[in-house]
Amino acid sequence: ELWPRYADERYFLSKSNKDFVDRNLFITIRDKETTCIKPYQKDLDLPHGLALDVLPLDYYPKNPAERKKQVRWALIYSLFCAQTVPEKHGAIMKWGSRILLGLTPKPLRYRIWKKAEKEMTKYGLAESDGITELCSGPGYMRNKYPIASFEDNLFLPFEGTEMPIPVGYDAYLSTAFGVYMTPPPADKQVPHHDAIIADMDKSYTEYKGEYGA
């Protein structure tokens, strides 16, 4: 409700719903005056500007059985919300996902993903002993971060301004990325996200006809 009232029209908030699926698991905010066309979205009619990912954090239940349930629901959510076949997580997951999506009509996919979302996010502070990421893929889904890392924030300089970061940023980054202050070897310094076209000076509208949509 707040976005249409207060946001700059230059930016587009994208979130999948019953009638629109952008193949992400989370909200993205896109700059309509730039271009960053992802391979998995090239056939979609949406603003293909540079995206800022808004990744949610959820509580990590302390009960091991509940944690296993949470992960199962998160995997179900991932499949039916993105509605794409995962290509990088093994043949079993790839073909199992393809079969499940093929057997499930689109209206039912939405109902399944909303049920899964409700179940995986139902845990609160009292029944949890950590924080996790359920919308960043199976790898990050395994991570457990200290609750205290996100109980406050601090402001640090960033490109001429100051931005808030979690007070426990070091614990988070170390868990997620290892020795994050040391650059990886040269052969590992490659992008992890593909783009068909990337242009920070021109709007995606100038590239109409050069990609799938």
Task: Give residue ranges: language-model regions.
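Conserved catalytic core of two-metal-ion nucleotidyltransferases
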Residues: 2-62, 81-90, 98-177, 183-213
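A short secondary-structure junction signal
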Residues: 64-69
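Short, His- and charge-rich active-site/binding loops that engage polyanionic ligands
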Residues: 71-74
